[in-house]
Amino acid sequence: MTVRRPLLAALVLAAVTVAAYLPVLQNGFVHYDDDLYVLDVVQVRDGLTQEGVAWTFTTWQGANWFPLTRLSWMIDAELYGLEPAGFHGTSLLLHVLAALLLHAALLRLTGAALPSLVVAAVFALHPLHVESVAWVAARKDVLSGVAFMAALWAYARQLEAQRPLPWALCVFAVMALGLMAKPMLVTLPCVLLLLDWWPAGRLVDDSGRLVPRRVARAFAEKLPLFALAAAASVVTVAAQRAGGALQALERFPLAVRLETAVEALAIYTLKTFWPVRLAVFHPHPEGGIPGWRTALAVALLLAVSATAFWLRRRAPWWAVGWLWFVGMLVPVLGIVQVGEAAHAERYSYLPQTGLVLALVWGLHHWATGRPARERGAALAAGAALAALALSTAAQVRVWRDDRSLFEHALRVTRDNPVAHINLAVVLAKEGQYGEAERHLDAASVLSPGSAHAWGIRGEVRLASERPAEARDDLVRAVALEPEAVRWRLGLARAHREAGELAAATVQLRAALARDPERADLHALLGLVLADRGETEAALDALAASLRIDPSPGPLHARRAVLL
């Protein structure tokens, strides 16, 4: 193959990927973590500043530590302000770069041009990956994806170099950067060991049998990478624990977690072939997973695993690809439950490549040297890629705004309280309080332990001038999440509108004890104290509010009246 052909293949790959994802440039932000990580974070909104850079390396955010990802958002804010097209364009470019690096890495590792291109094209065009590209908050996926693919390419160079140390250091550095984007790369050393098995052939003898001495030597080479992964795991667990993201066994018992993990693994496998019912959030099934579904999932996984084991010598790509797929998914299968989702499409962003690798090389091996099969395989691959591209373009449009995203989630999932709550927020902003309340009623039934279901319904009822009903909902929200300042602020407003000024004061003082730098808390406390006739205390509270945020004109006027 000439030099020009790989370059031409890369250009075509990039062009087709951009074409499939081009609608993303018309999408806005979604207020589901985009606000948590970007829109409501002053350090990000201000762009690249010395204080912001220091902040990104020294603080948790959303139960995560991903300074490289936050720096990328800061650069976007510096370049584009808060224009969503700029943020989406950066994510798309990173995704294209990851696909090109994967193509280059596989081509260098295997020397097989067409299969390498097909694997990279599936990675670039598969609709399971839309969530990672079209969601600004998922920037950590595409950024860590670039690092992961760059590490594969650098490792391929390490294997062929006469002086491998510089390339080994490059792999270490790229992995470290990737871990600062997302801790998903903790499994990278294991993937590199699999590549030592196939296609590098470093772990086996001429018959394809694994040689323990060679395995031990390859493992020892990667001890620095395993140490880096261990350190990143410690940091990740600390961040998740500090952010309250780790779920207790009482909430999700071990048996439930294992059932969920098995079903999630089967779902990721099946959706690789038939990517339907894609949604931003997949809830745990109400009442648990039926036994027959768990049995089918176990049967599927055992069948694939047995086949890969049986073919491990004469067709090692099956075992390598399957272990890559399963191994990279293990940290996100829910055995250590983080968050509320049963599974998420974005978790398959890097693992799926292992499964696709096995399938494509299996098809390549079956067709090679048989012209009729080669033509059939080429037609099948072309048709599959075209279908994936069209499906991806359609899925990108689902992410155009909050309403589209959560209406779609409710159409393709069942009993989804998160989708009900977030769609209710959209409707409430549009003044459709009755429709919003209907969704919040459903959410409170599906998830009676959700503070958001009760608290947001209380806020909606408060906005529709029903303070007594709002108060009852917000009391439940505070009981479920007593550390949340938002619910105490809402409850204080409900108490004030109901004329319960003493109760409002209690809630505001409790909220200020948790967050003394919230201007709106001081402001409302000042107004409540003024209503109670406590002029001096009211003036102090209003002054504190204006010290933190001097902009609100009505507060200046009210303070002047009290003076």
Task: For each feature predicted by the language model, list its residue ranges.
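Polytopic membrane enzymes that build or remodel cell-surface glycoconjugates and lipids
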Residues: M1-E459, A463, A479, R486
